[in-house]
Amino acid sequence: MADEAKSVTPINTSAFWVAALDNNELCAKFIKDIQKNKGAEKEALRKIAQLPRFYPQYDETIVESMQGFCDTLLIDMGIADLGLKCSLHIVYSDEANAFTALTEEGFAMCITTKLALKNGITYEILMGYVAHEFAHGALLHHARGFYAQAKERRKNELLGGIAAGLNALAAGMEAYNAAAYGIPTSGKDYDATIANIGNDIKISTLKHSFKYSREQEFEADLFAYRFLEHIGKGEEFINGLRILGTAYDALYDEYSDHPTIGSRIDFLKYVQLHPELGNKKNAKLKKKRTQP
């Protein structure tokens, strides 16, 4: 989260979002990079195009009677003033969850009926859930996730080629030494290097199947917390995470690196205890971009 968002005078919700989004250097860099339209960029755009779309005008799971409430919520949050192609819907489901779905023109934020009807839910907690999902959509987390995967895959292919080359080199040297000097070599130094590269390839490939990264989840949490903090209700997002509880974690069991509710609460508690913390990385990138 850009430090500029924290300095917006309360309460000006649309100005908060403008400051948070316009000063996000990593997102700005991605938008610039994706325009290169080379191998990794084309792969990311192709995968985004292949994702299923959500059609609010046709989807029968949407609770139509709650649409006015959803539209008002976006107005109260200042999101409706931003001019982004996004919408909010309550959808029928037995799962307590909130999610962001891509639409033809932008994205839709959805909250399930199971979650919306949970004990303890307040208007501000719903705002927190929406802010979290809005961050995923507005910061282009889907596309950035695909782009990171595409670049990582190319890195792995390069490392795989290096590993294969080292294998061939080690075998060639061993054969050469044995033939020329009658001294077989073990190739231990090469083996160690090859083993490290091979291990890196396996781990990084397994961890980068499509899903929000831990960093993206924490970033979306921070956006939600900072937004509610801006309106004087920061603790409510943490309460919202508590309401999600372990049942929410169970939905993401297949993602071994998806942060648990407990770890997300701990992260925000740390943020609460250290208000002096700033986004040094974002500030550094901004300085680099704006320097002549």
Please state what every model-predicted region is.
Residues 153-174:
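Hydrophobic alpha-helical membrane-anchor/signal-helix detector
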Residues 111, 220, 260:
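Residue-level signature of catalytic and energy-coupling elements of molecular machines
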Residues 221, 238-241, 265:
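Conserved positions within tetratricopeptide repeat
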Residues 3-157, 226-233, 240, 246-255, ...:
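Peri-catalytic and regulatory segments of divalent metal-dependent proteins
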Residues 167-236:
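Metalloprotease/metallohydrolase-associated module, dominated by Zn2+-dependent proteases
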Residues 250-273:
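Catalytic and substrate-binding regions of cell-wall glycan-acting enzymes that process beta-1,4-linked
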